[in-house]
């Protein structure tokens, strides 16, 4: 999806047919700059390229007459649109239908409000500048602010950019991965939830490199490319505390930056668009919840069972659980070791206990007690 960067330019990834009528679309990073009256594209986001990397191509907005849908002109190319620029038509391919509509709208709006300027030999100068840069050495640098003073130090050894060979190698990689966001990976034990390219900050040199990320049910790992089988690192989801949009993106001067906070380290990852950033945050957070959710629910169910079935209820006899059963308890039975006829005779001759015959044995008030003693003495006197 196209998005607006910090310099108020519209940026995003598209696939372009650089060689006319070749039918081969290569993935490039496009920048629409209305202030510079240009629509340029690079091999990748310039923030991720070595210092001094030149652009791959450029078109003046004044040269573009119309931008329209080209699905009928190129039926085999999905989500394709065309730019009419002078004597040539540039065919580009978006990620989806919404991406196509947004790019067509922003480009048509840009060419309408552009004021024509005097033409210059921009394409020729671009080709000359690219030829002049072929033999130069490209070095990536790291900028640190120490005491308010910027200090620039090289991050790696100088590499000679052998123009034709290096570009062909990059083009070969891009053509092999037509849509790197959805490039398939070899099947693994866990189902892949989300996969795609992002830019990650290194742990030691703090440099930014493009890596292929893959999220499954238990881990999130990153590879050097989508063709690699072994990941560079695997982060277990149980070690991830939170995933959120980075609050230091202004300090790092990075768009679409989010962070993965773990026990030992915070990983800073840059997506290609705001939509892709939010998609990654949502996917990783959902995987964490899905992994930790069943544990909480099972423990809560066990606790609920313990509260609903206390141990004291299990020791109560079944007959006493019903209060109505107390009124129908069986009467006294003879001992089992006595024969039945003899037991019946003994029980028939036994004096039955009646509660009213023992009421005189209960303690009474002092007056009642003294009166009963006098009555007893009076009864013993001779008459």
Curated annotation (Swiss-Prot):
Keywords: Cell membrane, Cytoplasm, Lipid-binding, Membrane, Nucleus, Phosphoprotein, Repeat. Residues 370-383 have a biased composition (Low complexity). This is Pleckstrin homology domain-containing family A member 1. Residues 7-112, 191-289 form the PH domain. The keyword Coiled coil does not apply. Binds specifically to phosphatidylinositol 3,4-diphosphate (PtdIns3,4P2), but not to other phosphoinositides. May recruit other proteins to the plasma membrane. It is found in: Cytoplasm; Cell membrane; Nucleus. GO terms for cellular component: cytosol; nucleoplasm; ruffle membrane. One of its GO terms (biological process) is multicellular organism growth. The gene is Plekha1. CDD domains: PH1_TAPP1_2, PH2_TAPP1_2.
């Amino acid at each position: 999806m196209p998005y607006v960067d910090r310099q108020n330019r519209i940026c995003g990834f598209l696939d372009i047919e650089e060689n006319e009528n070749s039918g081969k679309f290569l993935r490039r990073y496009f920048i629409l700059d209305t202030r510079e009256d240009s629509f340029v594209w690079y091999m990748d986001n310039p923030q991720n390229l070595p210092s001094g990397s030149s652009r791959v191509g450029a078109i003046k907005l004044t040269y573009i007459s119309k931008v329209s849908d080209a699905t009928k002109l190129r039926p085999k190319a999905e989500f394709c649109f065309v730019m009419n620029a002078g004597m040539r038509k540039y065919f580009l391919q978006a990620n989806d239908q919404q991406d196509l509509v947004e790019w067509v709208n922003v480009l048509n709006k840009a060419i309408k409000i552009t004021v024509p300027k005097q033409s210059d030999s921009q394409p020729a100068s671009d080709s000359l500048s690219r030829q002049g840069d072929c033999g130069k050495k490209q070095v990536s640098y790291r900028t640190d602010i120490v005491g308010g003073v910027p200090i620039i130090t090289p991050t790696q050894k100088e590499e000679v950019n052998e123009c034709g060979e290096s570009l062909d190698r990059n083009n070969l990689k891009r053509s092999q991965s037509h849509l790197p966001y959805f490039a398939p990976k070899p099947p693994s034990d866990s189902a892949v939830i989300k996969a795609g390219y992002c830019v990650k900050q290194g742990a030691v040199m703090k440099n930014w490199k493009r890596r292929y990320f893959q999220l499954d049910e238990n881990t999130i790992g990153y590879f050097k490319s989508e063709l690699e089988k072994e990941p560079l690192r695997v982060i277990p989801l149980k070690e991830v505390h939170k995933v959120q949009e980075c609050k230091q993106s202004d300090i790092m001067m990075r768009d679409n930056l989010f962070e993965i906070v773990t026990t030992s380290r915070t990983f800073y990852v840059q997506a290609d668009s705001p939509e892709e950033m939010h998609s990654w945050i949502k996917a990783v957070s959902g995987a964490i919840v899905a992994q930790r959710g069943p544990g909480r629910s099972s423990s809560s169910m066990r606790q609920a069972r313990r509260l609903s079935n206390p141990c004291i209820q299990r020791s109560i006899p079944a007959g006493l659980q019903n209060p109505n059963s107390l009124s129908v308890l069986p009467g006294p039975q003879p001992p089992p070791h006595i024969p039945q006829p003899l037991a019946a005779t003994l029980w028939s001759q036994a004096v039955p206990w009646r509660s009213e015959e023992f009421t005189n044995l209960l303690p009474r008030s002092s007056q009642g007690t003294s009166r009963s003693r006098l009555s007893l003495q009076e009864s013993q006197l001779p008459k």
